[in-house]
Amino acid sequence: MSLDINWSLLSQPDESATDQLSESLIALLNAQLAEAHRPSFIGPITVTAFDFGNAGPDLEVKDIRDVWRVFDQGDDEGDFAEEEKQREKEREERDKLRNEALKSSLDGERYELVDRYSSTEGTSSFEYQPEYDIHEQHGDDYRIRGRRPLSYTFGYPHDRLAVHRSSSSRSFIPFPFDHPPPALHIPSTPGLNPSLVSHPISARFSRRPMSIAASAAPRPTPRRRPIEPSSTSPSPPAHPAGLPPKVSSSSIPSLQLHLRLSHASDLHLTLLTSLQVNYPSALFMALPLKLSITGFQLNADIVMAYSGEKNRVHLTIVDDESNPAHKEDKQIPLGQRLLSNLQIESEIGHADAHVLRNVGKVERFIVDVVRKTLVDELVFPNFHTVAL
């Protein structure tokens, strides 16, 4: 089955739309060429002009079948590689944040008497409460001052309790002859845990660094009010029972087309680059090079597969040995069989000084590079995938 392509629609009747399409293709080609690997003696490559020409391709549909499994497997490998790169990047960021958090200078480390029942971690905002000052019974000047994190309460707005750091040289290490501080008596308030009052202050507070105390303090087990069974009802299931999970897919089914392409094109493509001499130093000399492709002859068997599940198109070229023309030209290299003719016009040098035109060796070299790239990148088992 043959397909008729109206190639003239690319240039008529709206030329402005054709110009926009050409500009978008030029921008796409320049973006791809900027990332492509090139030899050290070839400078940056830039596309400056593009024209579709008037001659269109001849397409013949040979077969329609299911998508080859190799396309989906190769696509999954590419997805897994991208996901692994993303996970590695996230892992590096987490390690970096963890290392920065572990960095701590012992010089100037502050010590606080931290309540081991406190659920507040790593806060540095404190409030002084003079109404909770407690004097020892033997006339000692040492006092326990009301200092607590602002975010912690006993269920009462002013129940904040901590121990102030002493600015004197008195040691906080307990000795046998020291008198223990009296237990703190807090008035009865609703919602206050009696266990917090039953322990003396010396048993509820410990002297440790703030960074260590926040991580080492055990958290109190929250009390949960039992819920009556009659007051709640089971939530509906996320997916109805007995039905398979919903699979997102495109409305277009997956299919694969085997096409025979024959294209004697008269398109026009202009590229600018340079020939660089890197001896005795880098970029010791550079010669401007202008290449103009004025036509080519392409004969190939193309496989185009569409994956409706992932909405992607896979494209590759196959070497069909059953083709009679290929049997006669078996001694010809594959690249030359696919691209039998490529017309190139070359200019080397500056236009305002001296220019060498149609240098045969340069043109043959460019043709060989194009054929080799075509075989290495598009001939099966190599293929390109386009995400729509």
From Swiss-Prot:
InterPro entries: Mdm12 (IPR027532), MMM1_dom (IPR019411), SMP_LBD (IPR031468)
UniProt topology in membrane: Peripheral membrane protein
UniProt entry keywords in alphabetical sequence: Endoplasmic reticulum, Lipid transport, Lipid-binding, Membrane, Mitochondrion, Mitochondrion outer membrane, Transport
The SMP-LTD domain, residue ranges: 1-388
Any single GO BP term: mitochondrion-endoplasmic reticulum membrane tethering
Any Pfam family hit: MMM1
Biased composition (Pro residues): 234-243
Domain of life of the organism encoding this protein: Eukaryota
Biased composition (Basic and acidic residues): 83-101
Region annotated Disordered, chain positions: 75-101, 209-249
Location(s) in or outside the cell: Mitochondrion outer membrane; Endoplasmic reticulum membrane
Gene Ontology molecular function, alphabetical: lipid binding
Keyword Cytoplasm: no
Annotated GO CC locations: endoplasmic reticulum membrane; ERMES complex
HAMAP family for this protein: Mdm12
Function: Component of the ERMES/MDM complex, which serves as a molecular tether to connect the endoplasmic reticulum (ER) and mitochondria. Components of this complex are involved in the control of mitochondrial shape and protein biogenesis, and function in nonvesicular lipid trafficking between the ER and mitochondria. MDM12 is required for the interaction of the ER-resident membrane protein MMM1 and the outer mitochondrial membrane-resident beta-barrel protein MDM10.
Domain notes: The SMP-LTD domain is a barrel-like domain that can bind various types of glycerophospholipids in its interior and mediate their transfer between two adjacent bilayers.
Quaternary state and interactors: Component of the ER-mitochondria encounter structure (ERMES) or MDM complex, composed of MMM1, MDM10, MDM12 and MDM34. A MMM1 homodimer associates with one molecule of MDM12 on each side in a pairwise head-to-tail manner, and the SMP-LTD domains of MMM1 and MDM12 generate a continuous hydrophobic tunnel for phospholipid trafficking.
Family named by the database record: Belongs to the MDM12 family.
PANTHER family: MITOCHONDRIAL DISTRIBUTION AND MORPHOLOGY PROTEIN 12
Protein name (database record): Mitochondrial distribution and morphology protein 12
Organism annotation: Cryptococcus neoformans var. neoformans serotype D (strain JEC21 / ATCC MYA-565)
